[in-house]
């Protein structure tokens, strides 16, 4: 399978090269970029060996179609929409790591991503409706048959996987869900940003995007799909001074206040028993982002507050792997008819 990595020098593209370069099932046949076009891979990343040392080409639909069966679009929001229809028409399957196709309505995307909507004049509501949300734990079968996959955001991944068993089976109320998440600075991408400068975020912890963070609506859309009911929740993200990693704490009210921590742990473990990358920890063992760094795993823990019938679910992921490119590779594996974790059996070099 020939794979194009478009946006190769961003964090998503770098992870894609690292994850695919030694995978015998795939060949990196095209690297695309704009600012970096005309340079070799080794010119940009001499510390990441790529045997073929591909030339990074100017992004071109025709060139991608000539050289690849599947395109991983590791691009800023809005840009993917300028390429996707042309690629699909030429028979290239698309896995988009941006938010361009995560919503089933183009109008909703335009409302949430209003700045990008002003810059990119889109008319592809049909593709928004066609795209499959690329969270394998929810859409496994649909992903395997799709030609356009919208890979989820990192925060939604860290929240929806732990919520899924409880919402889909009606174990928690649809109201009163609270998600408190903390992310490393790489979640903001590779472009310079004052907020992520070491002197700005080092030795500090800060919340941002309260109420109106873009991922709130993405989480609500999928949570509503899972539960079959409209869900409105509270989501508060925080920036923490580390490069990679994400920790989410999710609160919900149990419909059966008699459920214990052990009961809820069994619910999680049974639901995800066929997913080797999901590790449900024993009761009273709480996960650390260090445990999943540089892996595609998600670690979950659950605790019930019997005083008030609330459940607390903890999740940790590497925001650049399971929260981004590793998940895109899982989607690539599914559309290629391969095991979901092919090429993702990575070792965490603890500590």
From Swiss-Prot:
The active site is at 154. PROSITE patterns: ARGC. InterPro entries: AGPR_AS, AGPR_type-1, NAD(P)-bd_dom_sf, NAGSA_dehydrogenase, Semialdehyde_DH_NAD-bd. Gene3D superfamilies: Dihydrodipicolinate Reductase, domain 2 (3.30.360.10), NAD(P)-binding Rossmann-like Domain (3.40.50.720). Keywords: Amino-acid biosynthesis, Arginine biosynthesis, Cytoplasm, NADP, Oxidoreductase. It is found in: Cytoplasm. GO terms for biological process: L-arginine biosynthetic process. Its EC number is 1.2.1.38. Transmembrane segments: none annotated. It catalyses: N-acetyl-L-glutamate 5-semialdehyde + phosphate + NADP(+) = N-acetyl-L-glutamyl 5-phosphate + NADPH + H(+). GO terms for molecular function: N-acetyl-gamma-glutamyl-phosphate reductase activity; NAD binding; NADP+ binding. Pathway: Amino-acid biosynthesis; L-arginine biosynthesis; N(2)-acetyl-L-ornithine from L-glutamate: step 3/4. NCBIfam families: argC (TIGR01850). Catalyzes the NADPH-dependent reduction of N-acetyl-5-glutamyl phosphate to yield N-acetyl-L-glutamate 5-semialdehyde. PANTHER family: N-ACETYL-GAMMA-GLUTAMYL-PHOSPHATE REDUCTASE, CHLOROPLASTIC-RELATED (PTHR32338:SF10), N-ACETYL-GAMMA-GLUTAMYL-PHOSPHATE REDUCTASE, CHLOROPLASTIC-RELATED-RELATED (PTHR32338). Belongs to the NAGSA dehydrogenase family. Type 1 subfamily. This is N-acetyl-gamma-glutamyl-phosphate reductase. The lineage of its organism: Bacteria, Bacillati, Cyanobacteriota, Cyanophyceae, Synechococcales.
């Amino acid at each position: 399978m020939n794979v194009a990595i478009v946006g190769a020098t961003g964090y998503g593209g770098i992870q894609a090269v690292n994850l695919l370069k030694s995978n015998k099932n795939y060949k990196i046949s095209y690297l695309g970029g704009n600012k970096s076009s005309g340079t070799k891979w080794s010119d940009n990343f001499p510390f990441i060996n790529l045997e073929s040392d591909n030339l990074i080409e100017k992004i071109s639909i025709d060139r991608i179609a000539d050289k690849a069966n599947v395109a991983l679009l590791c691009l800023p929001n809005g840009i993917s929409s300028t390429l996707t229809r042309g690629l699909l028409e030429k028979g290239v399957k698309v896995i988009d790591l941006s938010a361009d196709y995560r919503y089933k309505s183009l109008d909703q995307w335009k409302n949430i991503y209003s700045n990008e909507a002003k810059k990119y004049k889109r008319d592809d509501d049909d593709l928004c409706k066609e795209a499959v949300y690329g969270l394998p734990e929810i859409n496994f079968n649909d992903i395997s048959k799709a030609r356009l996959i919208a890979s989820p955001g990192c925060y939604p991944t860290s929240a929806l996987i732990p919520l899924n068993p409880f919402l889909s089976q009606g174990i928690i109320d649809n109201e009163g869900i609270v998600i408190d998440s903390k992310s490393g600075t790489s979640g903001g991408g590779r472009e310079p940003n004052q907020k992520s400068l070491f002197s700005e975020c080092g030795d500090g912890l800060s919340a941002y995007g309260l109420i109106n963070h873009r991922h709130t609506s993405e989480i609500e859309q999928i949570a509503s799909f899972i539960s079959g009911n409209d869900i409105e929740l509270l989501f508060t993200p925080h920036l923490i001074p580390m490069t990679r990693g994400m920790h989410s704490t999710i609160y919900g009210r149990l419909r059966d206040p008699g459920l214990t921590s052990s009961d809820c742990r069994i619910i999680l473990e049974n639901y995800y028993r066929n997913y080797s990358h999901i590790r449900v920890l024993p009761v009273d063992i709480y996960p650390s982002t260090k445990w999943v760094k540089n892996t595609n795993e998600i670690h979950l823990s659950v605790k019930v507050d019997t005083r008030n019938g609330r459940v607390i679910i903890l999740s940790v992921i590497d925001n650049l792997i399971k929260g981004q490119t590793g998940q895109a590779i899982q989607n690539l594996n599914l559309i290629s008819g391969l095991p979901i974790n092919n090429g993702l059996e990575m070792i965490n070099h603890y500590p």
